[in-house]
């Protein structure tokens, strides 16, 4: 889970944020109750009380809908920088862990990963739309931190992101939020060490 997705908009269709939210919530609830495979467009429409055509006008299919429902769990609420990099990295770690540990995310992510294995182009588009804004936010955080001597000026931002995402995702899928505070502090400490390491090293 990274940045929040938004409903895909068709040409000429006015946005209806309330309907979008209704459908995304229904999708999350079905993922928790029935699992990824059983969460179909028809089932979501029934639960949300809308017709399937309303969903297809916003999302091209189930996978796109589930992606947006999962990304909506963190709603792009990137932590507000505190001025202390270690504190900020801890906040980022907690955000990633709790979003990925949400029951809907734990239900959806294995199914999505299986589909991405067979469709690398869709996964690449997802990365561009979902992860790039988060990487940019991290880059801005680390740039400011470097100016105050808390990070290396040329630290590897994408490596930090991959470490953050991979560690929290695996932990969330296998342990949920068990011992979350201790885990988050250990990961934040490791991220802090990476941030202080120049790429040239």
Language-model segments: which ranges?
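Basic, helix-initiating cap at the start of DNA-binding domains
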Residues: 1-34, 38-47, 53, 64
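Short amphipathic alpha-helical segment with a characteristic S/N-K-E followed by hydrophobic residues
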Residues: 38, 61-66, 76, 89, ...
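Short, basic, alpha-helical segments at the C-terminal edge of helix-turn-helix-like DNA-binding modules
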Residues: 41, 70-77
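Amphipathic alpha-helical segments used for helix-helix packing
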Residues: 64-70, 100-128
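Hydrophobic alpha-helical connector segments
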Residues: 77-109, 160
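Amphipathic alpha-helical packing segments from all-alpha helical-bundle domains
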Residues: 107, 120-147
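Hydrophobic alpha-helical segments that form the core
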Residues: 143, 152-174, 184-191
